[in-house]
Swiss-Prot record:
Organism: Mycobacterium marinum
Family statement: Belongs to the LysR transcriptional regulatory family.
Function: Required for the induction the katG gene for catalase. Involved in the response to hydrogen peroxide.
Alphabetical list of InterPro entries matching this protein: LysR_subst-bd, Tscrpt_reg_HTH_LysR, WH-like_DNA-bd_sf, WH_DNA-bd_sf
Protein name (Swiss-Prot/TrEMBL): Probable hydrogen peroxide-inducible genes activator
Gene that produces this protein: oxyR
Amino acid sequence: MTDKSYQPTLAGLRAFVAVAEKQHFGSAANALGVSQSTLSQALAALEAGLNLHLVERSTRRVFLTTEGRSLLPHAQAAVEAVEAFTTAAAGEADPLNGSIRFGIIPTVAPYVLPTVLAGLTRRLPTLTVRVIEDQTERLLTALREGSLDTALIALPADYRGLTEMPIYEEDFVLALPPGHPMADRHGVPVAALSELPLLLLDEGHCLRDQALDVCQNAGVRAELADTRAASLATAVQCVNGGLGVTLIPQSAVSVEAARSRVGLAHFAAPTPGRRIGLVYRASSGRDEAYRQLAAIMGESIGNEQQVRLVN
């Protein structure tokens, strides 16, 4: 009778499966990369632990006993499960060879995400990216709670326990109603915003805070328009309709200008702008993987957008 407390070893199960499939001890040993004596000892230990004969040995061939034939599918399933576990663990050890939960803010996603995903697909074909678009604060909370792996946001995040990895910087461009006299001008002083109705995004969008910071840093008290938008695309369409002006990042210019008739003006130096980069948990132990991820993103974005890569 088999002792139910007995726990077969993986070596014993592999030996049994190999012998059953090869029907030859020498061939089975070669398949496992062990000596024939090691194989025989592992199989003998399994049979002793089970108190069963699993194979009939002869000088030329190996035959399975009735018990061996009955237990073989279970042994094969156990070996396959361990191999699947090992493969999955190897994927977890390399976060860029599996699945990654990637957050991105709404004022970045529509303009760089297609380029980023194409670059990742080309350079990391085994990586599956799950994209979560949300406002900065909610992405940072998700990171700290472990429901996100990394996020592409405007820096600095200034969040305890998170590591920041800058990727690129870009200028802000002033979007104006069609036919505005400032359209196509360069060297526009930030102080000019004091004379223009400034459209802002809703609370929670980092671009709203950045626009207000631009005014504050320049000592300008902006005239805020009554209209607010939930997205940059809506803000630009409001500008297109003559409801005010707004700041848009350089990466958004080609997309937003193409679907509207807004005028564009460029600020005088030092040009206001923003820095975009990856953030992730400092405790993740994935610094090298995320450095590689950031490098691929930077290369992809730099090839398509008028931004300044941060080394």
